[in-house]
């Protein structure tokens, strides 16, 4: 369920629908999903999106992405390719880097407002589009 909701949230960001992305994040918080678990799933999704963007730039197709990530179906690879068309390579690279930075902060800073940091990160992703 978490991966599917993160997929929805990332698609909303790439579609410039911040309200929908924020609603998904709020739903995950209401379900008491740990912020670090949300970030881990988001990190994977952003890395996959970056891979799809690189595939597009390299004239590769969804099957290549599917095989690389060992997906069992074409559907998620096709959706990734569709989302990747809406973002630039630099946006993807920066999103992955910022995600890594937030991950280090969440794991090392005491008394961090992890939910607030995730909300801010989501707004930054949406705003940087």
Task: State where each predicted segment sits.
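Broad gene-expression machinery/nucleic-acid interaction feature
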Residues: 8, 101, 117
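Small-residue-rich helix-loop
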Residues: 1-91, 129
